[in-house]
Amino acid sequence: MTGTNTFNNADLSASIPEKWGSMMLEQKFPEFVLQDFASDLSDMIVDGDIVHVPNIYTNTFTASTQSTPGTEVTLQSPAEVDVTITVDTQKYIAFILDDKTMAQVARSYNLSEKYAQMAQKTLLRELEDALFGLYTSLTATALGSTIAAIADLDFRSAIAYMEGLEFRDGTAVFMGVKTYFNQFIGLSKISPNYASNFGVVASGLLGNSGQAGTQVKGVAYGIPVFTSTRVPSPTAVDKNVMLHSSAYGFATKKLQGSSKVRTQMDYKLENLGTLTVCDIVYGVGILRAEAGVVINSLSTSTVA
């Protein structure tokens, strides 16, 4: 029997609570793979604003022939080249959480810490983008194709270029995610992460060897391959790079301990709230322009 005048949600709305759980949907960030790989010169810039790295390979020795016994030897003094990185780019993120609002916000969310972490990772992403942007200064930028998918020959040509310049160890590849998953992973010479034990990275090719096994996506011809959403892709052409660790250099000012990003908090009476400022001071630059090669690929292409 259907009753009449039964209670419904509208009748009981004053007694039905709305709940907020502990879950919070947070911003996603890339893995900072290039910061872990490039030459970190931060320890050199405790004071000052320019890092100097002597280049003794541009001007080199040549072998002399001793034609006449007893003849005085010919001395050589190849000039060094001064390679510099200026560390003076400062970026920051600042916000205030006022007392009234924070007294009303659920404490389980720990908003101050969450927003500080978001700001820190945003600034680290700026550094990652600056490093990826250095591809335009590499000597070799024309491998691959701007109108087609990456091919096995493109990868082997990059290896031939690197080994032709004596770069055999300490090399890695950084690819756009579309190039890797829609094109490159289908090549027979690639061993994806799930199919390999990665002895090649066990020695800690990256600065943080604990992350190497999780960040690396595959190994091709013995070279670890990493992916990143920060690989530049002008006009839908991914600028994938094969790099030696000495190709790119960067430095950050250690404003707070060993962290790249400094976080400061200060209560502001005039604002009745807590000010949080995160900042980073960094510089990036090419150390060896010939120690890397751009492998172009059309990011919209697919390979079955």
Model-predicted segments: where are they?
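Alpha-helical scaffold segments that mediate packing/assembly in large oligomeric complexes
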Residues: 101-169, 294-304
